[in-house]
Design a protein with these regions (language model features):
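Carbohydrate-interacting regions of secretory-pathway proteins
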Residues: 20-449
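Bacterial Sec-dependent N-terminal signal peptides
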Residues: 1-21
Length: 449
């Protein structure tokens, strides 16, 4: 009997030692350990919860922890008025030298609207949306209106992950802020009639011990977004991604009509591959650039940003030797364009020369998610003859080439005179010089079998 008693004690001790350690951030009675920043919204303790009330004529208000946290697992529950917007800051800061102390940093979005982006990650007062829920639409049904919702946030090194009611929502790889405070946001209101509405938080607890031991396995995560420019995260490397541009040199690229990289018309500055401003002509400045090798089946991802009135493009299945005359090298094109200011947007047929379209062949929808003042992500998927265009995580075009319908489509386009256009088994990838300033970064490719 004594032997079994000792064994039981040992097992209990082992279980106790291995149990996850949680620390409450809110004692259910008062706001000890917290302080208010920026706005004048009111926070109260009611029924063992922190309740924030909206107030007119005041900016976003934050109830922040007096301590900072780096690697942690945070869990809590929230309940929010259906007409409000709110959030949970983490790894956030307030510095006098930054916008006069404005709270900034990562925010777990609380969004009860029909947009349904709860669980997404917003960079408050800094970069804006890092992980809108268009990147993971399966999680948009996780939020429960009028009920308590359970949040989980995991931060370990550069890995940041979120859950809502047990459903994985966001997953980013980022190194902007390694530590900071946690805060509960009461969003500013724009209509005085919305004053007095509330959002509540309860059961707020954090684990900061042996975090790596308790984070969720990779198989149970949302799709990852790498926010560190021109790098590959461990997950991307594991999945077979490669940098098509290294962010520093012209390695792997050349001019479409020359053996080397153009000596003018292009610049590499601060991790950005830039087409310099020219006369607006097609390949009349530095000329297009192409990959030195060809690609067959792949997923290509490119971040791009345009200046006002700009025109450019990303081409694939390119044969640089096909066009011996003036103009750009020939290939299928993911159009990059300022639809509002560039005249090419009104040419072609039914908008097939507008941004994200398969240039002069298939139009992207008018309601595509594009912001010409921000960075946008173009994704091109090629699997044999099946091709897709994606813009900012939303599929905007898909088509099949090498068939009668495709050939008929080409016959009514500007490519009609190029034999077998778009039907090549493989080709180069091209970034276009159209004489307008356009920026590229995060040029990545995953080759498919």
């Amino acid at each position: 009997m004594k032997k079994y008693f000792i064994l039981a004690c040992c097992l209990f001790g082992a279980l106790t030692m291995s149990a996850q350690t949680w620390e409450p951030l809110f004692n259910g009675k008062n706001l000890n350990g917290w302080k208010k920043l920026n706005g004048k919204a009111v926070y109260k303790v009611e029924n063992n919860a922190i309740v924030g009330y909206t107030k007119a004529n005041t900016p976003n208000t934050f109830l922040v922890t007096k301590k900072s946290y780096g690697d942690f697992i945070l869990e809590l529950e929230f309940k929010v008025d259906d007409s409000m917007n709110s959030g949970i800051q983490f790894r956030s800061e307030s510095k006098k030298e930054y916008q006069k102390g404005r709270v900034h940093g990562y925010q777990y979005e609380i969004d009860p609207s029909d947009r349904a982006w709860s669980g997404g990650i917003y960079d408050e007062a800094r970069r804006g949306w890092l992980y809108p829920m268009t990147k993971n639409p399966k999680a948009q049904t996780a939020f429960k209106k009028g009920e308590w919702n359970k949040v989980r946030i995991e931060c370990l090194g550069n890995s940041i992950r979120t859950w809502l009611n047990g459903i994985p929502c966001a997953n980013i790889w980022d190194d902007t802020t390694p530590s900071g405070f946690i805060a509960l946001q009461v969003h500013e209101i724009y209509n005085k009639a919305d004053a007095g509405k509330c959002v509540a938080w309860r059961d707020i607890r954090i684990c900061t011990t042996d975090v790596a031991k308790y984070v969720t396995p990779e198989a149970q995560l949302a799709p990852e977004a790498n926010m560190i420019a021109n790098t590959l995260s461990p997950t991307e490397k594991k999945e077979g991604w490669a940098l098509l541009w290294d962010g520093k040199t012209a390695e792997g690229w050349r001019g479409a009509r020359m053996a080397d990289f153009p000596k003018k018309g292009w610049a590499i500055e601060d991790g950005i591959l830039k087409v310099n401003k020219g006369d607006g002509g097609e390949s009349t400045n530095g000329g297009d650039i192409v990959t030195k090798r060809m690609y067959k089946n792949f997923i290509l991802s490119v971040d791009f940003k345009i200046t006002e009135g700009a025109n450019s493009g990303i081409k694939y299945f390119v044969n640089p030797d096909l066009n011996k005359g003036a103009g750009s090298a020939i290939g299928c094109e993911f159009q990059i364009l300022d639809d509002e200011k560039h005249p090419d947007a009104k040419m072609g047929v039914k908008g097939n020369r507008q941004v994200a379209s398969l240039y002069d062949l298939i139009p992207a929808p008018k309601d595509k998610p594009f912001n010409k003042k921000e960075w946008n992500t173009a994704t091109i998927v090629v699997k044999g003859n099946h091709v897709e265009h994606w813009l900012n995580g939303v599929k905007v075009i898909e088509y099949t080439r090498n068939n009668a319908m495709w050939n008929a489509l080409v016959a009514y386009s500007k490519y009609r005179d190029w034999p077998n256009f778009g039907n090549a088994e493989e080709g180069h990838i091209l970034l276009q010089d159209h004489g307008d300033e356009v920026w590229f970064k995060n040029v990545k490719i995953k080759e498919l079998k």
